């Protein structure tokens, strides 16, 4: 008989079992006997049977729970991420299963209520980068027209607090129309904002009273406390992961990869988080985040 998922229960049910149907807390009976699944409870209020996995990432999954947890640990402990192929090899999963499993874990890491970054006395750097394959490696019919330095790549715009959190966004184009709503909703008005001399970032930075920029085009990278080194360091980690670990990330899935990299950065060792802490905290995100295979657009190539 499979063991009862006691550790998962302790993490998700700190105050006792929670009925997913009526919400009653700590008013359930653990069903005993060989005819019942391990960890099966019955709510004393509505009489609904349930386990700790109902309403979570793991609900109705044929993958054993210990493999879900092992895959999560592998992804949380690797600074540049781990490909689905590698996860599958290590855990004995098929290519399709490991690909979908990894995307479900990434989905659980996405922030549901982002809130504000920065604030009074806080410094935030913001900039854009571009990720994706080289145009010369694509079939002629799929190449995009030349124009900017990001031709054929996907645009990522990010905000990073000095010694704090990062939040990155996949945007269709780096312009004020796409970015202004993001800043309005996620960047506190009293924040000290540092950017480079790029037209879009500089223009948006002017919306904040305490804004300064450095001009990379003339070799100016640091001027006192004014620089964008923090966000460039994050972009370096992101690109090494995208290019070196995953090799190819499709447009429709990029937001989930960004969620993964953001999460690891926000729960990094420099902020006092160990691999075990990062893993444990990630478990809290599995509730209410069931990603179906159809929602991943049933991509044909499961390369990452």
Regions found by a protein language model. Name each.
Residues 1-304:
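Residue-level recognition of single "structural anchor" positions
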């Amino acid at each position: 008989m499979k063991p009862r998922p006691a550790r998962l229960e302790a993490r998700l049910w700190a105050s006792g079992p929670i009925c997913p149907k009526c919400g009653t807390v700590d008013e359930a009976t653990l069903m005993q006997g060989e005819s019942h699944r391990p960890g099966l409870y019955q709510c004393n209020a509505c009489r609904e049977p349930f386990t700790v996995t109902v309403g979570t990432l793991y609900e109705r999954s044929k993958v054993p729970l210990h493999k879900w947890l092992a895959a999560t640990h592998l992804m949380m402990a690797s600074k540049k991420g781990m490909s689905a192929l590698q996860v599958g090899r290590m855990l004995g999963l098929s290519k399709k299963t490991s690909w979908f499993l990894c995307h479900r874990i990434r989905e659980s890491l996405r922030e549901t209520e982002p809130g504000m970054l920065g604030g009074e006395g806080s410094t935030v750097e913001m900039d854009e980068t571009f990720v994706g394959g080289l145009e010369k490696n694509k079939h002629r019919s799929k190449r995009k027209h030349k124009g900017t330095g990001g031709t054929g790549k996907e645009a990522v715009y990010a905000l990073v607090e000095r010694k704090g959190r990062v939040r990155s966004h996949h945007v269709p184009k780096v312009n004020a129309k796409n970015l202004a709503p993001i800043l309005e909703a996620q960047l506190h008005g009293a924040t000290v904002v540092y950017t480079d001399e790029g037209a879009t970032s500089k223009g948006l930075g002017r919306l904040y009273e305490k804004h300064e920029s450095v001009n990379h085009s003339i070799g100016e990278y640091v001027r006192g406390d004014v620089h964008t080194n923090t966000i460039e360091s994050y972009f370096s980690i992101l690109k090494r992961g995208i290019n070196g670990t995953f090799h190819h990330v499709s447009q429709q899935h990029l937001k989930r990869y960004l969620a993964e990299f953001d999460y690891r950065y926000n729960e990094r060792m420099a902020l006092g988080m160990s691999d075990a802490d990062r893993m444990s905290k990630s478990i809290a995100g599995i509730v209410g985040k069931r990603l179906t295979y159809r929602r991943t657009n049933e991509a044909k190539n499961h390369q990452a």
